[in-house]
Amino acid sequence: MPELPEVETVRRGLEHLIVGKKIVSVEVRVPKMVKTGVEDFQLDILGQTFESIGRRGKYLLLNLNRQTIISHLRMEGKYLLFEDEVPDNKHFHLFFGLDGGSTLVYQDVRKFGTFELLPKSQVEAYFVQKKIGPEPNAKDFKLKPFEEGLAKSHKVIKTLLLDQHLVAGLGNIYVDEVLWAAKVDPERLASQLKKSEIKRIHDETIRILQLAIEKGGSTIRSYKNSLGEDGSMQDCLQVYGKTDQPCARCATPIEKIKVGGRGTHFCPSCQKQ
C-alpha cells in the first residue's frame, strides 16, 4: 500500500504533469469507486481546471476551480499520463481527458481506490470527521499531544500508530522502520512507554518519513510514482522485509510476527520489552 512518502511523491509528479490542465472529458468504468455519486462527479468536474495538487496523510487532494477530488490510492492505485492514445488495460478505471490531447488515467488492480468530490469549503471538515492526525513534520507533529494520546490508549504501539489518529500517513512499512529505529517492541502497550521512548518514536517518525519523501518512496511490489519511476527508499529499509537477515545494529536475525493481524518485522534483541 502506498504510504505517506509514496503519496507525496505521486502528488509532486501530478503537480508537474497536470496543474493548469482543463478537464475536457471524463470516463468512469467502475462507478463504485466514486463514493459521492458517479453521475454528479462526471458532470461537475467537466470543464474545470486542475489548480493545485495537495495531500493530507495518505489522501491526494486534486484541487479544481470550484471543488476538490479526494483520492485514496488504497492498496494498488496509481496515476498514469498518456500524451496520445491510451493502451487497452483492464485495470484502467478512470480517465480524465485533458486539453492538449493528453489523458490522466487511474489504474488499480484491486479496485479498492476511492474518489470523493467535495466543495473546497468542506475539505477540512472531512478530515476532522475522519480524525486524521497531524502531518509527520516538525511544524505540525508536536511531542506533548502525542504523549497525551499514547497515555490514554489501550492499544499496542504498532496498532495505534497505524490508525492515523495521532499522526497521519504511517503504514506497515514505516511503522516497522520507526519502531526499529526507536528500539521499541511493536507489542508494547502505548500507555506504558517511557517518555524517552515516546520522544524517540516521535523524532524517528519525522526523520524516516522525510527521508522516504526525499528518496521518492519505497518500491515494494507494485508501487511506482506518477512518472512511472521506482522510488529508492527500499534501499534504506533496516527491518521491513528482512526476515531472518541480521539486524543492522546487533546482528540478531530479524523476526516476522503478526501484530493486530499485520505482518510485523522487528529485532527480538534490541527491541525487546
From Swiss-Prot:
Its EC number is 3.2.2.23, 4.2.99.18. The active site is at P2, E3, K58, R262. It catalyses: Hydrolysis of DNA containing ring-opened 7-methylguanine residues, releasing 2,6-diamino-4-hydroxy-5-(N-methyl)formamidopyrimidine; 2'-deoxyribonucleotide-(2'-deoxyribose 5'-phosphate)-2'-deoxyribonucleotide-DNA = a 3'-end 2'-deoxyribonucleotide-(2,3-dehydro-2,3-deoxyribose 5'-phosphate)-DNA + a 5'-end 5'-phospho-2'-deoxyribonucleoside-DNA + H(+). Binds 1 zinc ion per subunit. One of its GO terms (biological process) is base-excision repair. It comes from the Bacteria. Coiled coil: none annotated. One of its GO terms (molecular function) is damaged DNA binding. Belongs to the FPG family. Monomer. Involved in base excision repair of DNA damaged by oxidation or by mutagenic agents. Acts as a DNA glycosylase that recognizes and removes damaged bases. Has a preference for oxidized purines, such as 7,8-dihydro-8-oxoguanine (8-oxoG). Has AP (apurinic/apyrimidinic) lyase activity and introduces nicks in the DNA strand. Cleaves the DNA backbone by beta-delta elimination to generate a single-strand break at the site of the removed base with both 3'- and 5'-phosphates. PANTHER family: FORMAMIDOPYRIMIDINE-DNA GLYCOSYLASE. This is Formamidopyrimidine-DNA glycosylase. It comes from Streptococcus mutans serotype c (strain ATCC 700610 / UA159). The gene is mutM.
